[in-house]
Design a protein with these regions (language model features):
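P-loop NTP-binding catalytic core
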Residues: 44-126
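N-terminal anchoring/assembly modules that precede and organize ATP-driven motor systems
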Residues: 1-50
């Protein structure tokens, strides 16, 4: 399994259709599985994205780009491709390994800074 760094701009430029679901600072995850897109936010439970018009072939193209960017063939033998940007962690699972028979993609936001300071942790009893 290879993991290399990408730039956020690489994703924004190549896949603006995905980026629009990640722009909201409240969004934490975007998942494509079983043919559905799910968006998770800090303030609510995961919700299905309606009328996204992003097909299985679109996600396969996205996964192939992620695989290529990390020097992974992304095929049944190399069935997982993982990449990081400054703010995203991307994991793609090949359809040959998926129970649904479709490519699975998870895009998780990761912030560079600490969300909880030492003082905040002590104050709240963490």
């Amino acid at each position: 399994m290879n993991t290399l760094k990408l730039k956020d701009e690489d994703i924004q430029d190549a896949f603006p259709e995905i980026w629009k679901y990640l722009e909201d600072p409240d969004v934490t995850d975007l998942d494509f599985n079983c043919g559905n897109i799910w968006q998770s936010k800090v303030s609510s439970i995961p919700t299905r994205v309606e009328n996204a018009f992003l097909t299985e072939s679109y996600w396969e193209k996205f996964s192939a780009l992620v695989g290529k960017s990390v020097n992974c063939n992304f095929n049944p033998q190399e069935h997982t491709a993982m990449a990081d940007t400054q703010t995203l962690r991307i994991t793609c699972l090949h359809k040959s390994q998926s129970k649904s028979g479709l490519t699975n993609v998870n895009i998780r936001k990761s912030h560079g800074g600490l969300r909880i300071s030492r003082e905040m942790a002590l104050e709240n009893g963490y």
